[in-house]
């Protein structure tokens, strides 16, 4: 009997322009098929309406892309696979990413002959590096500004409910999935003092959580619902985060109401019988006085939800009406009415996961940009069933901005031991006492060579 694996705690949603969703999803599936076919980490959705990045997001001095995806592939498994991965990355819709500062100066600290790629200038930057030993690693890296690094560690430890494995003082990672020959990691990298982060606006990190009412008062920025099961917020550096609520088994639902909504609307910000109770009192995620003004500066750009015909007007749920969520102005481009935060609560909305031969199969999935449920009765390779018919004709994106990249590898990189246990309360953590972990087969090794950690 095949072992049933739990769904990943993290999903990376990529928001594509209209008509490009199918093409980008196929490009990702094709690339990852030869590395980790059993893992479905990246999901592409199409935006409800296009965004003009040139007007909204202006280039700033010394800003680094906030997210990268790095592939560490074993040379011992054959160079043919390495060449195949590079061949995929050099084809459309992939584009070469310029490794230079916004002022046009090249980055002298980049490794020789290192190439970077991206599907869009507001999506993660991709890179590939061959390694001599250990396992294949797919590493999603978030780059943190110097002052926010330790707070970011506490935040993601709380969301993932596990401790970070510290490799050195400015780099740590979480192992999300591991087999004998493959490891999936989320890592945090501290940027040098004075360098700011350029968040990728078309990239959204979605975490599976069991309780939302306990998390909301601990988050550094406002957290608002975009559907009955998902909430949107940001981390300290502006990276978009979605929290998808999966209540614990046995939690009842009465009259179509979700228990986590009741706690939030009643103002139960200090729940009893919770491992996060002491944390909410001390607010350890906001240790400095500068956090006071962060909420005032932060503007919540909720994902807009197109109104389906006749589906929301019939909603009589008093919880949602009590919050006063109403319609937005009509979209000038499509003439279709947009509605924000007004989805009726249904007990079975969200992702229903089926298992087939140890492989995750999606029965129903909520579109990250619209909040609607998308039915998918096919496994990974049948992506078109997840999109409407007009998504089938897709064109590749063409715009890439000149953001700067830095790639270094830790000089003391060895074989590391990962630690996966339940969350230690942030108030009980002493980051000055974190120790370097060694001797594990899941992480990158260096054989007598001085390498720097992949780093923007």
From Swiss-Prot:
Span list, region Disordered? 262-313
Keywords recorded for this protein, A-Z: Nucleus
- Quote the biased-composition stretches of kind Basic residues, using this chain's numbering: 289-300
Q: Which GO terms describe its cellular component?
A: mitochondrion; nucleoplasm
Q: Where in the cell is it found?
A: Nucleus
Pfam families hit by this protein: FAM124
According to UniProt, the tissues expressing it are described as: Expressed strongly in lung, at slightly lower levels in heart, kidney, brain and testis, and weakly in liver (at protein level). In brain, highly expressed in cortex, hippocampus, dentate gyrus, caudate putamen and cerebellum (at protein level).
Put simply, this protein is called Protein FAM124B
